[in-house]
């Protein structure tokens, strides 16, 4: 797993600044008032800091943006970074500013003079999130990233506040690594092995093999993987830190590679379908976070791991499969496979654990990208309370999410002539009909949200908190949802 950059908190030491060899970042409010650290740097650089702060370039900066002074005279450091940020910055402002600094982290390390800032832990969290790179498959790794050292007036408070944030960041990195892995590395077996290894953190982990699923009647899931040499699996992760109450259930789609099956995808862009297990990756990251921070909550995470390949044994368009629930499904398009996987895993989750609520995540439809782009995940729900709580958590964490409509009028689009339901409708309302399909496998008494993360799980250009590639979207929001609403 990609390791977080080392983050530590120290008391401010003005006398140490001249000899510091790491990059040095100092916070300056919009009005340009220099704090003690900035004043010392200004003296050391013979007024260069003050001149930069008084410049038009600094004036044009938005909150959280920065201006860099390279190779300043009088300093051992090669770079001084001036960050425009108020002492009373809001949490997301501080986090975004930290992310901007984390992006610059190199082998020499980074010293952030944050004395007097209220949201020191958020600043450090942002820096840790952005200081990520995936080079596990390169023949030569880049130099290891140096440490992030944060100067804080209330050092002990900042360190304590960051402890849980460190756990979240580790969960995000775990998700990103899983989503970034190529499919010849992250097979269904390798994926299951990595999740099983989290038993070392205190999670209870079990694996359902194909024979187990056959006994349970999971024809929908098994049909997807029958054309692959990689065996289909369901991995169940349990964290029971909240007493005797019913658990919260997270369910993830884990298609480790999606060719589309017999309804094969165009070759252009098919290499990106290594990320089609993004929902399972998020579930894994959340469960890792909960275990690391010893959450006082009961949560079960279930992921359905399959590979969708064309083969002489592969599922065909027109096949009818029987789900664990007993509903029959006409497979119109074998490339609409994720909903078949989720249908059986969601039903199993409800039968086995009787959860107090359930959220599924999946890179499910291209239609959600057409509707919401890469800024927001689609939120579909049968519960205003659950969807509202999730949207509140996502907003607090700065993760884009937008609620989409559902309703019985859409059911006619997936009505089958030969089975109870078909797995895809026409072009109209594609993400909604996918959610309507999943809704058939949710019991009336189960509050449920479906998160379509096709546009947010992996992106082609860098975001505020991640380089191009896997983002880890959803780990932060789901951890906050559980923390705020489901912990004792």
UniProtKB/Swiss-Prot annotation:
Keywords: Aminopeptidase, Cytoplasm, Hydrolase, Manganese, Metal-binding, Protease
Binding site for Mn(2+) 1: 258, 335, 337
Cofactor(s) essential for the protein: Mn(2+)
Residues the record marks as active site: 265, 339
InterPro entries associated with the record: Leucine_aapep/pepB, Macro_dom-like, Peptidase_M17_C, Peptidase_M17_leu_NH2_pept, Peptidase_M17_N
Cellular component, GO annotation: cytoplasm
Main location: cytoplasm
A Pfam family matched in the record: Peptidase_M17_N
Family annotation (NCBIfam families): PRK00913.2-2 (NF002075), PRK00913.2-4 (NF002077)
Family in the record: Belongs to the peptidase M17 family.
Protein name per the record: Probable cytosol aminopeptidase
Organism of this sequence: Dinoroseobacter shibae (strain DSM 16493 / NCIMB 14021 / DFL 12)
Gene: pepA
